[in-house]
């Protein structure tokens, strides 16, 4: 569980990034066309990329720290889609 998630949102392209921790980027694993998880070389999660969160909402399945991510997204009125495939 992490309490220091930082959400950045670019309205012009409807894209969000949630920073989990500051570290050098090593690789990204795409969960689907709208979601990717960024990792450091040690395998720790450093961020979450979300495309079209305002237009399509955000699925939590497969995301790390789903409770914290949900709270951050709902705080800026993004629709959270739990249990949807």
Could you tell me what each predicted segment is?
Residues 1-85:
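Small, basic N-terminal interaction modules of short regulatory proteins
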């Amino acid at each position: 569980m992490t309490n220091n998630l930082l959400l950045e949102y670019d309205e012009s392209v409807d894209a969000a990034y949630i920073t989990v921790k500051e570290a050098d980027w090593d690789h990204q694993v795409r969960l689907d066309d709208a979601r990717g998880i960024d990792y450091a070389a040690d395998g720790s999660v450093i961020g979450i990329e979300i495309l079209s969160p305002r237009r399509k909402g955000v699925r939590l399945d497969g995301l790390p720290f789903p409770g914290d991510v949900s709270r951050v997204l709902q705080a800026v009125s993004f629709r959270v889609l739990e249990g949807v495939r």
